[in-house]
Amino acid sequence: MAKTIKVTQVRSSIARLPKHKATLRGLGLRRINHTVELIDTPAIRGMINQVSYMVKVEE
């Protein structure tokens, strides 16, 4: 079974770069305190790294 990680949005996407807003949508995050469980892949890790100031990650 693939390893999963939980990603929670902790900061607002208002007044952020459009690229960062798109990254949050790509991760499936819609609002503050919204949590999604994702498969741990290099692509997902790269997306998380890009918006690390807006999300919290639990392994």
Curated annotation (Swiss-Prot):
GO terms for molecular function: structural constituent of ribosome. CDD domains: Ribosomal_L30. GO terms for cellular component: cytosolic large ribosomal subunit. InterPro entries: Ribo_uL30_ferredoxin-like_sf, Ribosomal_uL30_bac-type, Ribosomal_uL30_CS, Ribosomal_uL30_ferredoxin-like. One of its GO terms (biological process) is translation. SUPFAM superfamilies: Ribosomal protein L30p/L7e (SSF55129). The keyword Metal-binding does not apply. Keywords: Ribonucleoprotein, Ribosomal protein. Belongs to the universal ribosomal protein uL30 family. PANTHER family: LARGE RIBOSOMAL SUBUNIT PROTEIN UL30M, MITOCHONDRIAL RIBOSOMAL PROTEIN L30. Part of the 50S ribosomal subunit. This is Large ribosomal subunit protein uL30. It comes from Histophilus somni (strain 129Pt). The gene is rpmD.
